[in-house]
């Protein structure tokens, strides 16, 4: 029987706060690191820097709206759609793989992250979930940027470096997946709400970028 999702997430967070880098690296069921993993680590580091810079710029530019982590309502757009936290569990918590494979996902990849071709199922599942996260955020950011570009004030729009960093890591992972197109809104955009949404999305994405970077670091050092 799978443990309750809430209890599992709490357990993961407690473990993350106590496990050091090497412990996690030894626990993760992976093959020996390949040059592809090192390349993906570089991409994940670039992504983390890019989203951090974009968030900092947004907080400075949008100083008249709530844009700090204490002020915003935190939202995870991947909730109930992907399972990255569970899929990237360390070995000691991976007691039942069926608990982590509750969704149908494509595990076919030509990406350089798995260039060795001998990665474990759990590693592939983890990287596939990361790929799906990135695709969702990419779609959200592109839709949001299109709205921001319509703002007569032209106050802020997304840094191309961040969008490029997302695309580069997606290409390195290169999983086959079905992208569900977003429906275009016929409503007149509310630019104030869009900017608040931007702050919320950037905070959430930075947290996910930290998780992705740590995951790639563990894979590279294991």
UniProtKB/Swiss-Prot annotation:
Tell me a Gene Ontology molecular-function term this record carries.
cytokine activity
What are the GO cellular component annotations?
interleukin-12 complex
> Which Pfam families does the record match to this protein?
IL12
Localization, per the record, is:
Secreted
Q: Subunit composition?
A: Heterodimer with IL12B; disulfide-linked. This heterodimer is known as interleukin IL-12. Heterodimer with EBI3/IL27B; not disulfide-linked. This heterodimer is known as interleukin IL-35. Interacts with NBR1; this interaction promotes IL-12 secretion.
Principal place of residence: secreted
Regarding protein family, the annotation reads: Belongs to the IL-6 superfamily.
Q: Output this protein's name.
A: Interleukin-12 subunit alpha
User: Organism, per UniProt?
Assistant: Canis lupus familiaris (Dog)
Q: Which residues are glycosylated?
A: 42, 96, 110
Q: Which UniProt keywords apply?
A: Cytokine, Disulfide bond, Glycoprotein, Growth factor, Secreted, Signal
Q: Name one GO biological process term.
A: interleukin-12-mediated signaling pathway
